[in-house]
């Protein structure tokens, strides 16, 4: 029967800590003596797997010990040579992984191999040398108590897991062999039920331990997260203090303070003052506009008053003109008075004023003086007049001059 690596791995995974189980697997391997080198290499590869637990590796060690001893008794030297080439490396590695109680069992196996001269002296010396190497640095680490508790539970979980797998395989095999047509079907079913109940108990116990281990790991993880946050806060505080106390940064801040201009404290907000100034300017403009309107209104009133006065002058002139036609003797007096008034007005620097009445000759009532020229057009003022009215035009001129003098004053 040819050697099968899958079948060999299955036998290693199903080994139990009993003489019967180990002897059965050993007999099968002895039949594969032609493939002894392959068996030794597969055994080495299995024993060095990280996924294989220490208990399963211890059972593999027991199997190797049984095979080489039986091979020596049967003078099958192939297994001694093949396992002798890999024994030192494998035993040295698993010794670092084993806990203290398993290390004692490993040492007892090595002593048996040495006493019975299963391997050559060179192989035995190599094995002893590998066992004297320093233990794994993991054992020297200081672990939290929660992790230590989890490690203890984990060892139990590993053992229970293999028991669970073995019980499940046993239950599956028994259920496959159950034949309903058999006369002993009920008895076989009772046996299978017992195996199933045993498997259920082992699985439930394993589940409880795993839940407890997960809780411990989660608690440890929460503690580590809290410590991580605290350390990050400390790091931020240190960086802030170093940045604030940096001499180059302090000098830079001093220079910036010197550059920044200083301002005197005011009574109020500048914006409010500007608004007040704007309001004052608006008030001034309103006052100015009001004054202008007042002046305009006064000017209008003055013009109205002047117009009224002119109308009064015209009415008075007409009246006096009518009177002057009846009192021709007043013409000379009026002419003389007018002349005197004109001289008086010149002395007071009264502006020159001309009233054009479009008279033609001095005979028609035109009066000429050195400083002023007044012309009276009787015909334009009162219409067509008689000759008598023309002769008395001097009186009208005198009255007009008198009124003009009053207006000038």
Swiss-Prot record:
Residue ranges of every copy of the CID domain listed in the record: 1-135
An annotated GO BP: mRNA 3'-end processing
Acidic residues composition-biased segments: 266-289
Main location: nucleus
Keyword Transcription regulation: yes
CDD domains, per database record: CID_Rtt103 (cd17003)
Localization, UniProt: Nucleus
GO molecular function: DNA binding; RNA polymerase II C-terminal domain phosphoserine binding; RNA polymerase II complex binding
Alphabetical list of Pfam families matching this protein: CID
Keyword annotations from UniProtKB, A to Z: DNA-binding, Nucleus, Transcription, Transcription regulation
Alphabetical list of InterPro entries matching this protein: CID_dom, ENTH_VHS, Rtt103-like_CID
GO cellular component: a single term: site of double-strand break
Domain of life: Eukaryota
Basic and acidic residues bias locations: 307-323, 337-363, 370-380
Segments of this protein annotated with the region Disordered: 250-409
Misc: Present with 3930 molecules/cell in log phase SD medium.
Family: Belongs to the UPF0400 (RTT103) family.
Biological role: Involved in transcription termination by RNA polymerase II and in regulation of Ty1 transposition.
Subunit structure: Interacts with PCF11, RAI1, RAT1, RPO21 and RBP2.
Name recorded for this polypeptide: Regulator of Ty1 transposition protein 103
């Amino acid at each position: 029967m040819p050697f099968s690596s899958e079948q060999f791995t299955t036998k290693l995974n199903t080994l139990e800590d009993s003489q019967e189980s180990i002897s059965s697997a050993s007999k099968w391997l002895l039949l594969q003596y032609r493939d002894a080198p392959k068996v030794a290499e597969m055994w080495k590869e299995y024993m060095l797997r990280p996924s294989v637990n220490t208990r399963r590796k211890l059972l593999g060690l027991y199997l190797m010990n049984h095979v080489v001893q039986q091979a020596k008794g049967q003078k099958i030297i192939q297994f001694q040579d093949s396992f002798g080439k890999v024994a030192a490396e494998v035993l040295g590695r698993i010794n670092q992984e084993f806990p203290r109680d398993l290390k004692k069992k490993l040492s007892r196996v090595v002593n048996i191999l040495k006493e019975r001269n299963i391997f050559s002296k060179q192989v035995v010396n190599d094995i002893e040398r590998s066992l004297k190497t320093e233990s794994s640095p993991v054992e020297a680490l200081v672990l939290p108590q929660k992790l230590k508790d989890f490690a203890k539970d984990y060892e139990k979980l590993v053992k229970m897991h293999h028991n669970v797998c073995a019980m499940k395989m046993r239950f599956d095999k028994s259920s496959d062999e159950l034949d309903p047509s058999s006369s002993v079907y009920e008895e076989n079913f009772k046996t299978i039920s017992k195996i199933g109940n045993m498997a259920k108990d082992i699985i439930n116990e394993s589940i409880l331990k795993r839940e407890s281990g997960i809780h411990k790991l989660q608690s440890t993880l929460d503690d580590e997260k809290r410590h991580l946050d605290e350390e990050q806060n400390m790091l931020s505080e240190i960086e802030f203090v170093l940045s604030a106390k940096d001499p180059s940064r302090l000098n830079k801040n001093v220079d910036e303070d010197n550059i920044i201009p200083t301002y005197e404290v005011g009574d109020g907000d500048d914006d409010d003052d500007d608004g007040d100034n704007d309001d004052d300017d608006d008030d001034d403009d309103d006052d100015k506009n009001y004054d202008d309107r007042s002046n305009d209104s006064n000017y209008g009133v003055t013009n109205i008053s002047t117009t009224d006065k002119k109308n009064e002058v015209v009415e008075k002139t007409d009246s006096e003109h009518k009177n002057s036609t009846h009192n021709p003797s007043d013409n000379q007096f009026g002419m003389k008075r007018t002349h005197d008034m004109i001289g008086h007005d010149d002395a007071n620097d009264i502006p020159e004023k001309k009233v054009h009445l479009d008279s033609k000759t001095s005979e028609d009532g035109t009066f000429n003086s050195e400083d002023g020229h007044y012309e009276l057009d009787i015909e334009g003022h009162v219409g067509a007049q008689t000759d008598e009215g023309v002769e008395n035009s001097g009186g009208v001129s005198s009255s007009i001059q008198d009124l003009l003098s009053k207006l000038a004053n």
